[in-house]
Regions:
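Surface-exposed loop/turn elements that mediate protein-protein interactions on large endomembrane-trafficking
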Residues: 1-10, 28-51, 72-97, 115-137, ...
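Repeated scaffold domains used in trafficking and secretory/extracellular systems
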Residues: 3-20, 26, 45-65, 90-110, ...
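A generic structured-segment signal
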Residues: 232-233, 243
Length: 259
């Protein structure tokens, strides 16, 4: 590591999209938008781009489309960071639950907010009830932001569901798993899901059904996350550092040169 940047002190989060960077201070709701080339000179004492208030949430896809939910304003803001720092549009919303039970993402330019307290999903402001599909499952998580797609994936301890962005119809894709889920991922025409019991699911090219595999050497306490670089993705356990090649046969990566 040759350089470091002083980030805001209150729960900072950094989102990257091409040449644009969003620095979000979760504790205060302050959001800065900067060029990646200028990140080394970022000053957390400078005026923020947006002040979203406490308990706000942000999400940005790889094209730089950012959505931000401000509970204090009761609005979801859309910002096309690739072309402007200004708000493109806003939508009035009412979100149930608490800040700890809510999360935000986007698919194909549509924002979605999941509330795990009520097992409900807001899709562009329309509420979709997921309680029947999630049942007694726990730990529901929204998929990572995706530039493309016509439905959003929600993983939970018992499986995986998809919700149509157009109709709100809910379909169960996986129903027989267990463990803590990773945030599902849609990338380069494929959907991915994984759980800490070692089960991994992948579907590509619009196939009607996905393929399930068991990943070797998965710790039961794994904290899983799909990590991406362009069109490449791996599954990583943030606790142990173990990584699996989910775009191949799901093998544990112990030689990066061979990969």
């Amino acid at each position: 590591i040759s350089d470091s940047v002083a980030l805001p002190p209150n729960q900072p989060e950094v989102l990257l999209a091409g040449t644009r960077v969003a620095v979000f201070e979760q504790g205060t709701g302050e959001l800065w938008l900067v060029n990646a080339a200028e990140l080394s000179t970022f000053d957390a004492q400078s005026d923020s781009t947006l002040s979203l208030g406490t308990d706000a949430m942000v999400s940005m896809d790889s094209a730089g489309t950012l959505f931000a939910y401000s509970p204090s304003a009761g609005l979801v803001y859309r910002v096309n960071t690739a072309s402007s720092d200004g708000v493109d549009s806003s939508q009035s919303v009412t979100v149930a639950g608490t800040s700890s039970s809510r999360s935000i993402s986007s698919v194909g330019g549509h924002w979605v907010i999941l509330d795990t307290q009520t097992d409900s999903l807001l899709v562009d402001g329309r509420t979709v009830d997921l309680s029947a599909e999630l049942g007694t499952g726990t730990g529901a998580v929204l998929q990572w932001p995706s530039v493309d797609g016509d439905r959003v994936l929600v993983g939970y301890s018992g499986g995986l569901v998809a919700v149509s962005l157009g109709s709100g119809a809910v379909s169960s894709l996986v129903t027989d798993t267990a463990g803590s889920p990773a945030r599902p991922l849609t990338l380069a025409g494929c959907d991915y899901a994984a759980w800490s019991n070692g089960q991994n699911w992948r579907r590509c090219g619009g196939a009607s059904e996905g393929a399930t595999a068991v990943l070797a050497s998965m710790p039961g306490t794994a904290r899983l996350s799909f990590e991406t670089n362009g069109a490449r993705a791996v599954l990583n356990d943030r606790r142990s550092g173990a990584t699996w090649a989910v775009q191949r046969a799901g093998e544990l990566i112990d030689n990066w040169d061979e990969l």
